Amino acid sequence: MATNRRVSRVAELIKREVSQMLINGIKDDRVGTGMVSVTDVDVSGDLQHAKIYVSIYGTEEAKAETMAGLKSATGFVRSELGARVRLRRTPEVTFIEDRSIERGTKVLTLLNKLENARSLDDIPSADDSLDED
């Protein structure tokens, strides 16, 4: 069992290496359909499994196509990680679509709408100022 510090260091290293692979290592055209970025990597305590969370910008169709390309490139990514990262065993790689950025954007949009509606309610109308006289 690896220490928490080692697990987090390995996760950061995997994140950096997979990000580099997304830029110029994976030749599958489907991966380039949507803009892809690695948002997080969870590595198990025994360093045998790595969940790679990716954020994909684009249409739902482009996202599905990109995820299919990433899933088919899993073997390549694992073998490249084995060559680039010095570990006794290369972890099994799983790509998971991270929709937290989308959800965050939706929440911010809703908050902005509420703030705009509230500020419109706070502005006194011309009729209100005439009634006070």
Swiss-Prot record:
Keywords: Cytoplasm, Ribosome biogenesis. It is found in: Cytoplasm. It comes from the Bacteria. The keyword Cytoplasm applies. It holds the Pfam family RBFA. One of its GO terms (biological process) is maturation of SSU-rRNA. One of its GO terms (cellular component) is cytosol. InterPro entries: KH_dom-like_a/b (IPR015946), RbfA (IPR000238), RbfA_dom_sf (IPR023799), Ribosome-bd_factorA_CS (IPR020053). Gene3D superfamilies: 3.30.300.20. The keyword Cytoplasm applies. GO terms for molecular function: ribosomal small subunit binding. PANTHER family: RIBOSOME-BINDING FACTOR A, CHLOROPLASTIC-RELATED. One of several proteins that assist in the late maturation steps of the functional core of the 30S ribosomal subunit. Associates with free 30S ribosomal subunits (but not with 30S subunits that are part of 70S ribosomes or polysomes). Required for efficient processing of 16S rRNA. May interact with the 5'-terminal helix region of 16S rRNA. Monomer. Binds 30S ribosomal subunits, but not 50S ribosomal subunits or 70S ribosomes. Belongs to the RbfA family. This is Ribosome-binding factor A.
